[in-house]
Structure formats: C-alpha cells, structure tokens
Amino acid sequence: MTHHLTDNYLANLSIATSLLSLCQLVQPEWLNEFIRLGTTPLNSSSGETSLEAHFDFLSISKFRPTFSPSLPESQKHFNKWEPNEERVNLFRKFRFICMTEKIREMDGELRDAIHRGGGTLENFDIHSDISKFHQALTRSRAKEGKSVVVIGDIDAIQTAVGSAAWEALLAEAKRLVPFFNLS
C-alpha cells in the first residue's frame, strides 16, 4: 500500500497503521485524478499528459487531508503526517499481550498496527485464571528480550469478569510489568 485515502488527518488505528507502513495520506480526490489521468488518451486534444505516456505520481501537496478539529495543536503540522523512516518497526522492541474476552475478538486493526510496527502479539483470554495470566506475563517477559505491553479495554474487561477479577488481573500485571494507564 502506498497511499491512504482520507478526508481528515485523524488520530486513529487505521491512519496509525498507514503511517507505520510509510503511506502517504491523501484526499480521495487524489485517486479520482489519478484514475482520470490514467484514462486520458495518449494523444489528448486537451493537451493533458496521459499517465501511460509519462508516469508520475500526482503532487501530494494538492491533495492533503484537512486537520480534524479533534487533533491537538501539536499534531496540526503536515510533517507529523508524512512518511517517516523512524516509524518503521516502531514496536520491534515490544511484545503486546492483548486481554480479550475471546481470543478471536482481537481487534483486527490493532493486530495489523502492531504487526506493521514490527511488534509481536499474544492474546490472553480474560476468563482464564490468574495463574495462567502470571504464566503469560512471565513467558512474554522472557521471550526475545522485548518489553511487555499489556493492553485491553478496561470497561469491557470489568463487564465481562467483574470488578474483583479485574482488580486481580490488574494487580498481577502491575507486579510484573511497568504500569502506564493511557485511557
């Protein structure tokens, strides 16, 4: 994938995955223009150059998305949204444990972002007992010398297993992994 079509620069998983993949973010009109030029005849009477005669990607600056009003000012700079080699393998030093109710419920966009960023991923079923969670954390810490990141939807976990079980999982995670609450 080379380009991601979006009307707005947004802080979401889909765009994060594209940034990890060094994609250009462009408005959908970019693709429309690209297709139009691709179908322009070789000897166009309008004087336009057909992509078939002279292939060149369209200028990105003409098709930049607009900044979402929800973005903080610090993120409203075009250079923050351009491909950046420093993002390649951003997660390579991390092993993610995703806490989900059912292993198959793992968010596909989240999985894709982790893999595109070079991270490794393990799922943990929150209905398993605390000893299995301890084993998963210990095993993950020992593998590949990577830092462990435990992620999950707090509200969904509490709803699924109850507050007491959630508190036990949280205590075990805090005991074995440095804790940062990003919610």
What is the meaning of each model-derived region?
Residues M1-R64, K102-S183:
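BRCT (BRCA1 C-terminal) domain core and associated BRCT-interaction motifs
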Residues S44-R92:
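A conserved helix-loop-strand patch within extracytoplasmic ligand-binding domains
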Residues R92-F94, G145-K146:
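Short coil/turn segments at beta-strand junctions that form active-site/ligand-binding loops
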Residues F94-K102:
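Conserved short N-terminal element of RNA/RNP-binding modules in eukaryotic RBPs
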